[in-house]
Regions:
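Compositionally biased terminal segments of proteins
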Residues: 1-194
Length: 194
């Protein structure tokens, strides 16, 4: 059985350096540290989590799941001299002005948008270190997001395909029931082409 824990691979470091996106990790670490200072647990989802699981693809923002979005926003933007500020017109997004990285704050227990069926998991660990969402939950969130907007969110499906291949994920990976069939179809299609 493959290891299902994050494994930042050398390719992710090289990619971040070559594309000038190391600031994404810096912004995520700053946010995690501020949240930890106020005993708020977090989980990293999205492209940064995908990188941490071994698929080095470009991402320019950070997605953080927290138990209470309003509390997290207040903590992250409490320092009036920054470097994290709210983004006008986007209630759940902040920007680290040092790196120009956008940080989306996502609600645990809720879904991404209407039509989605997989809720964001509840973070339980308070830490200044990045807490990466478990792989099977990341796969579930990615497939759910893709199913709701298959054209606009096509990268989510690609992330799943790449993670299945790179991590040699099993067909019986325990994903959310709402996306189980989609996972099986994707896994089977990959096997049919190899």
């Amino acid at each position: 059985m493959p290891q299902l824990t994050p494994m930042t691979d050398q390719d992710a470091y090289i990619l971040r350096d070559a594309t000038g996106t190391t600031g994404v990790v810096d912004a995520a670490r700053l946010a995690a540290g501020r949240l930890a200072d106020h005993l708020i647990p977090h989980l990293i989802v999205g492209g940064l989590a995908v990188q941490e699981y071994g698929y080095p693809r470009v991402t320019i923002d950070v997605e953080i799941v927290v138990p209470d979005v309003l509390d997290a926003l207040e903590i992250l933007t409490a320092d009036v001299i920054g470097p994290i500020f709210r983004v006008r017109g986007l209630e759940d997004r902040v920007r680290d002005v040092r790196t120009q990285t956008m940080i989306d704050i996502l609600p645990a227990g809720k879904v991404l948008k209407r039509g989605c069926r997989v809720p964001f998991p509840l973070p339980t660990v308070v830490s200044e270190f990045l807490q990466i969402v478990p792989l099977e939950k990341l796969i579930s969130l990615k497939l759910d997001s893709w199913a709701g907007s298959p054209v606009r969110r096509h990268k989510d499906k690609t992330d799943v395909i790449e993670l299945i291949q790179r991590r040699k994920l099993p067909r019986d990976l325990v994903v959310h029931a709402a996306v189980r069939q989609s996972y099986l179809e994707t896994w089977d299609a990959i096997q049919a082409e190899t």
